[in-house]
């Protein structure tokens, strides 16, 4: 609850009550020694925040949740992939956030499955700098990690697609974006498979994922 850092708490114009809070495997009244976090969430519930509770047990929050996903213990990862499957394939994710704040543009070598680095392309190149495909100029471009910017001006990094890049030893290597690899992995978990793994019905998974994705803002506590 970021409101604790503001003098006026929830009344501050800088703070917006989350429309949805996911309480993921986190029975706060029992696991937080002073239960401060629990009271914060209850305060937000009183102000309209909806709860998605993900817990095998009927916890205090699960009993009051808008959505309670009673998953099989130990299948949280599969359920998370199910959420992502819905959000990506129904385009409910924040595309601007993906573009600006993730490494989805970075290239992965098909031959090794590892991130392509500046050191792969040029002698003396940094292992900390990564490579994207500049869709505007149709060539690789280097992301300088220390400076948090591209070494070339006006780079338009491709978020999806295949490319072929020349390495410093003269060989060529096929590459694809982190985003494409990520989406491929997510698509290995369609809702039918996730429901079979977690024992949570497909409709419940989809409804909860949509509720979370369409709530602005939303948060996950785990």
Language-model-detected regions and their locations in the chain:
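Extended redox/cofactor-interaction regions of prokaryotic respiratory oxidoreductases
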Residues: 1-42, 47-52, 78, 156-185, ...
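Short, well-ordered beta-strand core segments
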Residues: 21, 51, 68-70, 218
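Short beta-strand/turn micro-motifs composed of small residues
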Residues: 25, 55, 222
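Flexible, active-site-proximal loop/turn residues at the rims of small-molecule/cofactor binding pockets
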Residues: 27-28, 57, 74
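Short, well-ordered, mixed-charge alpha-helical segments that flank or form enzyme active sites
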Residues: 30-31, 60-62
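Long, well-ordered, tryptophan-enriched scaffold segments
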Residues: 48, 62-63, 67-213
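Short, polar loop motifs at secondary-structure junctions
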Residues: 54-60
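Glycine-rich, aromatic-lined ligand/substrate-binding cores of catalytic
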Residues: 211-222
């Amino acid at each position: 609850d970021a409101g604790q850092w503001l003098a006026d708490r929830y009344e501050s114009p800088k703070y917006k009550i989350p429309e949805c809070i996911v309480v993921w495997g986190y029975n706060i009244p029992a696991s937080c020694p002073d239960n401060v976090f629990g009271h914060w969430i209850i305060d937000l519930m009183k102000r309209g925040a909806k709860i998605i509770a993900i817990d095998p047990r009927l916890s205090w929050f699960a009993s009051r949740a808008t959505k309670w996903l009673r998953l099989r213990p130990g299948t949280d990862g599969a359920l998370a992939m199910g959420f992502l499957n819905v959000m990506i394939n129904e385009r409910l994710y924040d595309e601007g956030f993906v573009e600006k704040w993730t490494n989805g543009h970075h290239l992965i070598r098909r031959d090794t499955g590892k991130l392509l680095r500046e050191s792969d392309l040029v002698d003396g190149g940094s292992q900390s700098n990564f490579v994207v495909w500049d869709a505007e100029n149709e060539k690789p471009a280097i992301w300088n990690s220390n400076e948090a910017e591209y070494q070339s001006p006006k780079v338009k990094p491709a978020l999806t697609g295949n490319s072929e890049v020349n390495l410093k030893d003269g060989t060529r290597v096929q590459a694809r974006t982190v985003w494409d690899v990520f989406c491929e992995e997510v698509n290995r978990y369609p809702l039918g498979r996730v429901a079979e793994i977690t024992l949570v019905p497909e409709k419940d998974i989809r409804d909860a994922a949509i509720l979370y994705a369409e709530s602005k803002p939303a948060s996950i506590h785990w």
